Amino acid sequence: MPEYLSPGVYVEEISTGPRPIAGVATSIAGMVGVTARGPESGKPRLVTSMLDFHRLFGGFLTPPDKAGTDAADDRGIRWWLLPLAVKGFFDNGGQKLFIKRVVPAQADAQAAAWALKPAAEQKPAPGATDFELLVEATQPGAGGNDLRFDVRAVEAGRFPLVVADPPDSAPAAPPPDPAKVVVTQKGGLKTGVWVVLIRATGVGDPTFHLLADDGSPAAQGGFEFTLAPAAPAPVVAKGDTLVQVDFEAAVREVSAGAPPVTETFRAANLKALAKEVVDRSNFVTVTTGAPARLKAAVPAALPPAKLFKPFIGLTLTKGSAGESGLTAADYVGLDGGSGRRTGIQALEDIDEVAMCAVPGVWNGTVLDGLITHCTTLGDRFAVLDGPPNADLEGIRDFRAALSTDRAALYYPWLRVPDPGGATAPAAAPPSGHLIGVYARTDVERGVHKAPANTVLRGVIPGTGLAADITRREQDLLNPHGINALRAFPNLGQRVWGARTLSDDTRWQYVNVRRLFLFIEESIDEGLQWVVFEPNAEQLWASVRQSITAFLTTVWHSGALAGTTPEEAFHVACDRTTMTEDDLAQGRLICEVAVAPVFPAEFVIVRIQQATRESLTA
C-alpha cells in the first residue's frame, strides 16, 4: 500500500480486467544441415530470405559423384541438400528461418586458401612464413572455393620530378645518386608508400618502387626521396613523374544460383591492406609474410599492360568441410549449454522455433534425435524426409519404425530446377517446401487450418514429383500416416495429406496437434506473471479470466468447434481443481478443455435416384 504523508492530489494507476495472453508465432522454423560456409559455433542464425541465406551461409552445394552419393545414401545422409530446402521454404511462403550449420566432429575440415610465393601458388606448411600473402577463407567449407581475391594498384596522386643541380660554387661533387628523386610538391607523398616512375619520353617499362628516407636534408627546390628497390637504379630526367599508388583488394563470392557479393578494401601498402581485410571482411583473412619477402614480392618489373590491372588474381581452392566424414552424431549434436550446443540440440537455444527439419536426412538416429527434441521441449513440430528412391512398399517399411504425434512424413521427393543451371532437375527433399507451406498456411488462414490441398511452389511444373501417386496408391499410404504429394490436372501439384505419425487417433491430424502446441505455448508464456503471486481466490479468478479471454479469441478465429464459447472450451481454476495439499505444496492447478475443429478429410456426397413424384410429395 502506498503511504500518504503530505496533503495533495495523488494519481494512481489501477489494473482492470485480466492480463491478456498473446498468441505465440507458429510460422518460425529451424533447420539443421551442412552449408558452404557460415558460423560453426554459437546459436542458430536467423535468415529472412534466400539472399540473406547466401550472404551468411554461402551458395548451393555441389553434389558428390555417384560413388559419393551412394556412400551418403548408405548412411541416410544427403548432406548437400540443405540450401535447396531453404529455397523451398522461402518459395512456399516461409519468412523466418533459423539455421544451424553442421560440421564433422573429426578435424578434417579446412578453409580454402591461396598463397603468393616466389615460385608457386600453394598453401605453406603450418607455421611457415615463406610466403608474401596468404589468403584464407574465414570459415572451413567448400564455400571458400567460390571466393575470388583480386589486388590491383590504383593511382592516388601524381608528382612532377625535378633534378637538383649542384651549386656552381661547390667543389667537384660526386655524380648524383640516380636513385635520388626530388618532387616539387610533396603533397601527401611520404616515405613508405609505393610509387611508379613514369617516363616523360614514354620509353621504358614502368616499375614499382618504395619511397625510402635515408635522413638526407631536403634538396634545393623540392623534397628528396630514395627509390628502392633500385636494381638497376632508375635514371631520373626532367619531366618524369612519380605516380603514387594505393593497393585495392576486391573479394568476390560467386557461387551457383546465388547473386555475387563483393567486398572492396584500399590501403597505401600491402601490410595495411591485409589489416583492412582482416578487420572488415566477412569472407577471407589475409596474412602477410616476412617483411623482406613482402618487399620483394611487389612486382618490381610489372609489365606495362598490367600496371593498373589486378596483379594478384586468385581463386581460393581446396576448401572442404569434410562432409564425407559426417555422422549421425554430428547432426544430433551435443548439449554444451546455451550458445555451445551443436546440431539439433542447438535449436533449443531458439524458443521461437515452432517447426523444424533436417532436410535430406533419413538416418534413423538423426530422426529419433529430432523427434526426441520436439517431444522434450513440447513446443514444436517436425517434418521428416523418407528415402529418396523408396517405392510404396519401401516408404511404408520406413514409416513402420516411427510413431509420434510430433512429426509428419511426406512422399515422394521433389524435382526442382538445378541451381547450377544443368538441364536435368535436381532431387530435393520435401521437408523444406512443406515447412514453407506450413508457414504460409499459418499466416493466411491460421494454425488450425490443415496445411493441405495447397499448391507446391518452386518445383518443376508438371513433373515436380519424383513419383506419380494415384488415389489407389494413396489408399495404401494415408492409413499409415504417410502424406502424399500428388499432381492433379488443371490443379497443379498439391499437398494431399495432413496426418501425423501418431497411432493415437486423437492426434492423427497435423493441424490439431499444432493447434494444441500453439494454445499450450501461448498460455505458458502468458501466465509467467502468476509465479509467486499469492495463491488464493483472487489469483485463480484472474487466471480463469485471462485464459477465457484468450480462448474466446481463438474460438472467434474458427479454430474451435461449437456455436458458443461454452461449447468450444471450458476453464476451471478453483477449489475443485486443487486440494489443500496442492496449496501447501505451492501448486496452482488450472484445467482447460478445448474442442478443436478437425479437417474435412473425407468429403462424402450421397446421391440417390428419385422420381419427380417422390421429390414433390
Please state what every model-predicted region is.
Residues 201-293:
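Small/polar beta-strand repeat architecture
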Residues 1-113, 120, 130-140, 203-204, ...:
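Structured, hydrophobic secondary-structure cores that serve as assembly/anchoring elements
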Residues 157-162, 271-277, 612-617:
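Short, cationic low-complexity segments
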Residues 289-340:
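Long, low-complexity, polar/charged, intrinsically disordered or flexibly structured peripheral segments
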Residues 114-136, 142-229:
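Autoprocessing Asn-cyclization modules and mimics
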Residues 128-131, 189-191, 238-248, 588:
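A short, compositionally biased
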Residues 42-45, 169, 176-179, 192-193, ...:
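Glycine-centered loop/turn motifs
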